[in-house]
Curated annotation (Swiss-Prot):
Belongs to the CheD family. Its EC number is 3.5.1.44. It comes from the Bacteria. Probably deamidates glutamine residues to glutamate on methyl-accepting chemotaxis receptors (MCPs), playing an important role in chemotaxis. SUPFAM superfamilies: CNF1/YfiH-like putative cysteine hydrolases (SSF64438). One of its GO terms (molecular function) is protein-glutamine glutaminase activity. Coiled coil: none annotated. This is Probable chemoreceptor glutamine deamidase CheD 1. It comes from Ruegeria sp. (strain TM1040).
Length: 187
């Protein structure tokens, strides 16, 4: 399965973003600390995607943004379905949720618990997951086949500092309201 990563173009999925493709030449990539990447796919149709969310919920801030788990999951699943996936074929792989700082609450564990519960409630089986621990991960995902690769990041101290700053910015800034053209169906 590792040969699906050869001769491909890499598309980076940043915090608060999601990507969907039917192109077998595209591989999604992201680096995670306490954040979560849900990789959801329908290998029979050849479509899939990855999200990268920062926090499980907006904690009462009223935020509707892909920075938050529920919205990120809804956007990803709807995006995959719009590309022709059958809900009954969807499978997931989940990564991230590390405890990046002893000085912060365990945001990673909260994120991991959220995504596992969300997928279970939605009836989407989690085929594999790598969550928790104390180190960052780089994840590559071939969305059309569901193949995934993970490597642990050796020097993740800077990532932990960046995540603390991102959490602070997210909690301080109001979330962007979706444009009318976003047209997302929540289920």
């Amino acid at each position: 399965m590792s040969n699906v990563f050869q001769n491909t173009s890499t598309v980076t999925v940043l915090q608060g973003d999601y990507k969907v493709t039917t192109d077998p030449k595209v591989v999604f990539s992201t680096v995670l600390g306490s954040c979560i990447a849900a990789c959801i796919y329908d290998e029979q149709v050849g479509v899939g995607g990855m999200n990268h969310f920062l926090l499980a919920s907006s904690a009462g801030s009223g935020g509707v943004s892909a920075r938050y788990g529920v919205h990120a999951m809804e956007l990803l699943i709807n995006g995959i379905m719009k590309k022709g996936a059958l809900r009954s074929n969807l499978k997931a792989k989940v990564f991230g949720g590390a405890k990046m700082s002893a000085n912060l609450s365990d945001i990673g564990a909260n994120n991991a618990d959220f995504v596992q519960r969300f997928l279970r409630d939605e009836g989407i089986p989690v085929i594999s997951s790598s969550v928790g621990g104390t180190s960052a991960r780089r994840v590559r995902f071939h969305a059309c086949s569901g193949a995934a690769q993970q490597t642990h990041v050796a020097d993740d101290r800077r990532l932990g500092e960046e995540e603390r700053a991102a959490v602070a910015r997210t909690q301080a800034a109001p979330a962007r309201k979706p444009a009318a053209a976003d047209n997302v169906t929540l289920f």
